[in-house]
Amino acid sequence: YLRGFEIAVREGHARSIMTSYNPLNGYWTASNYDLVTTILRGQWGYTGLVMSDWWAEGNDRGGAGSTKHVAAMVRAQNDVFMVVADPEHNSGGDDLATALAEGRLTRGELQRSAANICRFLLQTPAFRRGIGRTSALDDQLEAMAEQDMQQAAQSGQPLTLRDGTAIDITAI
């Protein structure tokens, strides 16, 4: 069953993956260490972001599934739990703080997921533009836009936006 997913991840150069709602071999996929860490990250070499489906359940050691079992998801390297209405006040009542205090989750496991999230963000075009690094496509599109602006200014015609607003760019 996994071959199609492996092809999509490797050949499609996936940068983010959402785990499904369902259990597989007794473990909900959002918290399935073998699936997310051993296979996806280990065997396939995936380094991107993994997020749960909205209000996905997780379980620990084959127990009952619950949206509160977020520590098991973090341990499996499911980096982002979707969705929490008020994370500052733990409105979902997840078990992260308790699991950390009891030693069922380590600071290193939390840091590993934080590193996965940061690695993902550092590779986004928005981040690259924010630090002044653009791709060849960004540079090409910017040059084309500049050329279009110059041609419009030389023609003496106003630039018309999608909403119909006309802008006189001859003085630009």
Task: Locate each region found by the language model.
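Conserved, mostly hydrophobic/aromatic
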Residues: 1, 17, 53, 77, ...
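Structured alpha-helical segments in the cores of large, soluble enzyme domains
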Residues: 2-13, 36-43, 119
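Solvent-exposed loop/turn segments at secondary-structure junctions
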Residues: 23-26, 55-58, 86-89
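Preference for extracellular/luminal or secreted protein segments
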Residues: 42, 62-172
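Short acidic, glycine-rich surface-loop motifs adjacent to enzyme active sites
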Residues: 4-28
